[in-house]
């Protein structure tokens, strides 16, 4: 609604609109702080040797966060794993994603742990039952006209595209 029309509205309606807007802003701010705190808690798992239950919790958190971010941007949101994240952590989380989506179908490919050549120096993501290089996937999505955003997970931080200020390190 344009400001020119807003000023002609009755006082009660203007106050309600302002109140609703401020309430939405507070809710958004609260969610961003909750996401920031959760990211901070989960980033500590990337530096240690997490237990299977901690890896499961990390996987569920990242999946939920990706769903939320995808809804906020009205597009696909994937988890980009930087090369500095220990292989045992990122592959375990991707295995968990695969199990949730497909069960044990094609699990042999993911369990081999040698999906990508060791000399590959690229960030990876799990998409549609496959572990793929992000650069190759970006080229494919661009050619198809599909917009995608990433939650970037590195050894020291989890970065979301929600707010560029939310970089937890």
UniProtKB/Swiss-Prot annotation:
Keywords: Host-virus interaction
Region ranges (Binding to host SKP1 protein): 9-22
Motif placement: LXCXE motif, interaction with host RBR: 110-114
Cited function: Interacts with and disrupts the function of host retinoblastoma-related proteins RBR, which are key regulators of the cell cycle. Induces transcriptional activation of E2F-regulated S-phase and G2/M-phase-specific genes. Inactivation of the ability of RBR to arrest the cell cycle leads to the stimulation of viral DNA replication.
Family membership noted in the UniProt record: Belongs to the nanovirus Clink protein family.
Subunit text: Interacts with host SKP1. Interacts (via LXCXE domain) with host retinoblastoma-related protein 1 (RBR1). Interacts (via LXCXE domain) with retinoblastoma-related proteins (RBR).
This protein's name: Cell cycle link protein
Species, as recorded: Faba bean necrotic yellows virus (isolate Syrian SV292-88)
